[in-house]
Amino acid sequence: MQTLRDVAVGETVKIVKLHGQGAVKRRMMDVGLTKGASVHVQKVAPLGDPIEITVRNYALSIRKADADMIEVVPE
């Protein structure tokens, strides 16, 4: 299982599953991180947190902990 946290800068992946429950999962879905969405990793901060991604044509920064909950496959 590859998570969004494992994706290298410049790669594009597709979301296959969101882990997590309740408000955390709902928040991720509200910002466009849904099953089947294409995600491009733009950059990662020096200490690895946060991760800047592009999803549905807008930029988004997420924490490492949130990126660990997003299961992805290469596009």
Positions of the model-derived regions?
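Short alpha-helix capping/helix-loop boundary micro-motifs
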Residues: V24-R27
